[in-house]
Amino acid sequence: MKIGIVCYPTFGGSGVVATELGMALADKGHEVHFITYNQPVKLDFISHNLHFHEVLIEEYPLFQYQPYELALSTKMVDVVEKHQLEVLHVHYAIPHAYAAFMAKQMLKEKGIHIKVVTTLHGTDITLVGSHPTYKTAVEFSINNSDVVTAVSRNLKDTTNRLFTIKKEIDVIYNFIDVDKYEHAHKEECKLIALAKLDERILTHVSNFRPVKRTEDVIRIFNQVQQEIPSKLLMVGDGPERAKTEQLVRELEISDKVIFLGNSNEVAKILCYSDVFLLPSVTESFGLAALEAMAASTAVISTNTGGLPEVNIHGKTGFLSDLGDVNDMAKNAISILKDDETLLQFKQNAKEHTKQFALKNILPFYEAIYKSCILKV
């Protein structure tokens, strides 16, 4: 099949999933074309059947904000025509689903009938898409897609609650390449560079946006380190990083918290970890938690959004109410204080991720592409 993938080219979950999906499809022999404004950060090679098309936005002084949707839809038309694509798979509803609809209409005028698959990832629905400024356009775009998928049952239910959706939403969970985490563990974990041998390692990975509540991460860790010798690795970057670093200084734990910034080596970093902290306001799925579990790391998270579908309470980690820092710290300590308990949680976490392996999820997307291409 010839597939166009439209996504944000960033470290965010939707961009990572879209990029890894495209690379996996190319590995299986499909022809894949990424259409976005920068080369996706996870796209580290181009091949005969894996392509990148940059969306260029011309600056024009009349516009306060440059019209990316127009440039994107025009590029979609160009790539579909030139490479005879059969389906456009757009990740994140805003603005990709709307741009895809415009492209579809323009192509229809040329006698070309492209199919559009829209995958909803979370904040495109819960935080942005439901805003009155965008809601009507997002609802329209979803209803005019040929197929709509969501990354969790919770996100499907939320979408149906917030919008008037006239078509079925298929749930296809996010996935991970479990082999990547196996390789990371086979390489030597240079733990000694980060912590003493008797210290536990806690980790947080995110884009440091307010929804991730990174200050809660610090407060949880502060309680843990008072009970158990430990270090905290903070991976990622974003608007809340400065405030988070300031809180670390105020609590006088700068010697125990390491800020690593953005990284393409998350699998290797997670191989050091014992517990992963994710106290988010909401997670449509919780890809960061799943990645941690694949690296045999127990998860302490909130019980919001799709997280209960990923993190099994009392088995792979624990779930707590939003903002309940004390409960999350207590749960983390209960896992970390005993070697046998920690090992059991780590083994459970690793085992649970097998159902989310790329090889198990990829066929669902292939089936959707085939069915919508065949549908007249």
What are the functions of these language-model segments?
Residues 181-196, 364:
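A short helix/loop element that forms part of the nucleotide-sugar donor recognition site in Leloir-type
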Residues 195-212, 218-221:
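Conserved donor-binding/catalytic core segment of Leloir-type glycosyltransferases
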Residues 154, 175:
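Carbohydrate-associated surface elements
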Residues 298-301, 311:
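Short hydrophobic beta-strand element within catalytic cores of glycosyltransferases
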Residues 313-314, 318-325, 334-339:
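Conserved acidic donor-binding segment of nucleotide-sugar-dependent glycosyltransferases
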Residues 262, 281:
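Aromatic "clamp/platform" in nucleotide-sugar-dependent glycosyltransferases that forms part
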Residues 7-11, 23-68:
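N-terminal strand-loop element at the rim of the active site
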